[in-house]
């Protein structure tokens, strides 16, 4: 069975493939013939943005996700704006730099990642989610992962997502948790 993922982000696709491959064949939106469709994420929540990503695509199973990093000391920012925290011309590095600047004098470093996966199957749309709690580091650590991974240490661990192997990260990450709930929903 094919799962079309409404993304061309190779990091996300790699994580998803590692977690569901063997049971399902994962295709990016471009591989499925939808490369010219670029939904605008203008929702006010992760749930809305995840659904926006899947609505224009068709297939046996279509999924789209949105993820946010919610920092307690910043009243939940960057939250739904995590991917564009440093502005429309921002990137992962600029987003991390902005977050570290804003956290410079903060003692409360608690944060959590939340991933919402929207699923379209047989005309039905539903969402599942996964949360990973942890804390923000004072500087970037590690070379793996993407996004805020070098700044986030999950609860119960002493290293950032970027310092973990893919297997370690997938076992505890927000996206890994959401994907496991998604796979269970198919069975």
Task: Show the residue positions of the predicted features.
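Anionic-ligand binding patches
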Residues: 2-4, 10-187
């Amino acid at each position: 069975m094919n799962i079309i993922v409404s993304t061309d982000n190779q990091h996300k696709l790699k994580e998803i493939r590692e977690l569901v491959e063997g049971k399902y064949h994962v295709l990016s939106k471009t591989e499925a013939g939808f490369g010219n469709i670029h939904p605008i994420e203008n929702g006010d929540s992760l749930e809305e943005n995840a659904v926006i990503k899947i609505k224009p695509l068709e297939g046996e199973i279509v999924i789209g996700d949105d993820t946010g990093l919610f920092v307690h000391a910043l009243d939940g920012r960057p939250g739904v704006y995590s991917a564009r925290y440093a502005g429309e011309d921002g990137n992962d590095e600029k987003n991390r730099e902005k977050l570290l600047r804003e956290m410079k004098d903060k003692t409360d470093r608690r944060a959590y990642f939340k991933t919402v996966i929207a699923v379209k199957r047989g005309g039905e749309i539903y969402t599942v989610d996964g949360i990973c709690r942890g804390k923000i580091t004072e500087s970037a650590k590690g070379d793996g992962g993407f996004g805020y991974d070098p700044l986030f240490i999950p609860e119960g661990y002493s290293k950032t997502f970027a310092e973990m192997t893919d297997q370690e990260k997938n076992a505890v990450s927000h996206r890994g948790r959401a994907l496991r709930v998604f796979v269970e929903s198919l069975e």
